Amino acid sequence: MAKLDVFDIKNKKVGEIELSDSVFNDEVKEYLIHEAVKIQLANRRAGTVGVKNRSAVAGSGKKPFKQKGTGQARQGCRRAPQYPGGGVAFGPQAKTYNLSMNKKARRAAMRSALSLLFKNNKLTVLNNIDLDNVSTKNFVGILNGFTLDKTLVVTDVENRNLELSARNVKNVKVLKSEGLNIFDIMKYQSVIFTENSVRKVEGALQS
């Protein structure tokens, strides 16, 4: 099994942790990672753009004047595109960009992303990262001790002090293990796990 050193928040080694090979040392399938990221980003799109065509514009459908005998061009109704306030011809309509990926492929993509981080030495495991109070300075000091930047921090439980301490730090994001997703894994250059969060992620992604 793959192993990683476990550190405390002062960057002192306090032990080792065995990682599941099926989660953190799996075959890296880059095409699956690409597909999963593409789907996640597509599903964020709202697709709310839209204009009213002649059937959606409020107003009467009555013919404005008779067909013949006026000398004017024939008209069907005042909701037509050529009238002020009429509907738009061939304008953009709201659409959904949602894509889907089956659970087996989604989990395989997550395992590939985590395995890629492990093989590139971008994973750090801490025994815990509890903060007694809200302090951005203390949190930045912890990160500087590991010489990390653009970092994703994954915890096993909600840690309000940690979240508030990190929210104003550039290129840092704190997530619970349940919220871990492939886009954030690939976006951040390094990932810090707590020991318990590693076990939770392994339990969720075990093949």
UniProtKB/Swiss-Prot annotation:
One of its GO terms (biological process) is translation. Pfam families: Ribosomal_L4. Signal peptide: none annotated. The keyword Cytoplasm does not apply. GO terms for cellular component: ribonucleoprotein complex; ribosome. GO terms for molecular function: rRNA binding; structural constituent of ribosome. Residues 58-85 are annotated as: Disordered. Disulfide bonds: none annotated. It comes from the Bacteria. Keywords: Ribonucleoprotein, Ribosomal protein, RNA-binding, rRNA-binding. One of the primary rRNA binding proteins, this protein initially binds near the 5'-end of the 23S rRNA. It is important during the early stages of 50S assembly. It makes multiple contacts with different domains of the 23S rRNA in the assembled 50S subunit and ribosome. Forms part of the polypeptide exit tunnel. Belongs to the universal ribosomal protein uL4 family. HAMAP family: Ribosomal_uL4_B. Part of the 50S ribosomal subunit. This is Large ribosomal subunit protein uL4. It comes from Geotalea uraniireducens (strain Rf4) (Geobacter uraniireducens). The lineage of its organism: Bacteria, Pseudomonadati, Thermodesulfobacteriota, Desulfuromonadia, Geobacterales. The gene is rplD.
